[in-house]
A protein has these predicted regions:
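A short pre-motif secondary-structure segment
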Residues: 120-121
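Helix-turn-helix DNA-binding module
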Residues: 127-144
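N-terminal interaction/assembly modules
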Residues: 1-108, 162-185
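Short, mixed-charge amphipathic alpha-helical segments
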Residues: 105-112, 134
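Short, charged/polar micro-motifs that form catalytic or ligand-binding hotspots
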Residues: 96, 110, 139-142
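Short, locally clustered residues in the helix-turn-helix/winged-helix DNA-binding domain
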Residues: 111, 125-126, 157
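DNA major-groove recognition helices of helix-turn-helix
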Residues: 145-163
Length: 185
């Protein structure tokens, strides 16, 4: 059970961090993706440039012995280096894409919270207001306030880990806002 509690605390820290720094995290991720894309373009350009060199004919004898073979080996080694770098950059782009999707999904999950829980989480983590100030403004006992805060984090975790698509989460969010408006009337 201790491992489960530790995992839940880690998820909670990630959720808090994403909510606090959502825009900045997305901006950084997209900037990294642009940098990786530029590197991929450069490697592709180098690959095309290398491929355009005249072929090395190994059947021609050279006065210097193995000069053609050495040049051919260097050429093959460089081609392999380029392929390896390109694969690594594509993998990095894949990781960055997953990271951006995760940030976006956490924020979507936050959007579907019930009104009170949403307002608590929004003020504490998104707006960065002091816990004690928010608690006092809600006029709830500490125990009830903390239960609502924990419940909100739990909802975000559960929806994040669910099989729901992001589109389905958006529909939940839209449904919640309609229900909330009906409750206010």
């Amino acid at each position: 059970m201790s491992d489960l509690n530790n995992a839940m605390r880690v998820y909670e820290k990630i959720i808090k961090n994403v909510l606090r720094h959502h825009d900045e995290l997305l901006r950084q991720t997209y900037e990294q993706m642009i940098d990786v894309r530029k590197k991929i373009d450069e490697i592709t350009r180098q690959s095309i440039e290398i491929a355009s060199y005249p072929k090395i004919d190994l059947s021609i004898e050279s006065n210097r012995g193995g000069e053609h073979r050495d040049l051919f080996d260097a050429y093959l080694k460089y081609q392999k280096l380029i392929r390896t770098q390109k694969e690594e950059l594509i993998n990095e782009m894949h990781v960055l894409t997953i990271q951006a999707e995760g940030i976006h999904r956490i924020y979507l999950c936050f959007q579907i919270l019930p009104r009170v829980e949403y307002r608590i989480i929004n003020r504490i983590y998104v707006k960065g207001e002091l816990y004690k100030t928010v608690e006092e403004d809600f006029g709830l006992s500490h125990r009830i306030f903390e239960q609502k805060r924990q419940q909100a984090i739990q909802i975000i975790q559960n929806v994040y880990k669910s099989d729901l698509s992001n589109e389905q989460i958006v529909y939940l969010c839209k449904g919640n806002s309609i229900i909330q408006k009906e409750r206010d009337v």
